[in-house]
Amino acid sequence: IPGVMVWSTFVLAIVLAFVKPLWAIYFIIVFDCYWLVRICYLLIYLLNSWFKYRRAVKINWLEKVKKIMGWEKVYHLIILPTYKEPVNVLRTTFGSLAAINYPLDKLIVVLAGEERDQVNFLNTTQIIEKEFGHIFFKFLITLHPKDIEGELAGKGANATWAAKQATKLIDELQIPYEDVLVSNFDADTCPHPEYFSYLTYTFLLHPNRTRASYQPVAVYNNNIWDSPAMLRIINNSTTFWLFTDLARPERLFTFSSHCMSF
């Protein structure tokens, strides 16, 4: 339906220009006014989210979370589903994890690969494990089997398999499930240095924390200056759109890299 409405609008404007030129002028003026009002409306939400974001990133959230009793009991299970990702992409991701302002001995990192990409994945994991495996509390490698009956191959299936394998590790370590936060990241997600401290702070103060989902701000600027001009425009436009949605409670949803209680 949205596609039909878009093309109908274009076709109607062109047809009216020949059949009823005056109507076409009125139609275009109304259409332009509609989008002017809508852009101003969205700009308010965009600026609201942007100023909140800028204030949040300037705060040392680790200092604040340390004032909450029991913060050190919280562990973060980070699942990174991959499929044919080159080692330099994963190296950037793990480099950002290693640089966060949060105790790394509270992080359980799962690098989840696909059996369809087994050779490339195992070669990549050897490099990543050698460089970063020792800096986290636990570093787990999983391989999602192919052709599981009734399963649709994709990130969700890979992450689900990885979570099931991580559950065995958490049970062995006897960590209470309510003390574990699961972050389902994309393979190229680079968290802000304060992200996990802020996440822990929010989690501990939430009145119903084990029944909530936590959606971070997604800013698509990892390799923006290495991307083609058109892709940069698309990425920036997506970032702006997501910022406007963050300020609208009725538009909140989880996507891409998000977190919830185990």
Q: Where do the language-model regions lie?
A:
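Short aromatic/hydrophobic "clamp" motif used to bind/position activated sugar donors
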Residues: V182
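Short, acidic, metal-binding catalytic loop of nucleotide-sugar glycosyltransferases
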Residues: T93-K106, R116, E131, L205-H206
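A conserved acidic beta->alpha catalytic loop
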Residues: G113-I128, H144-E149
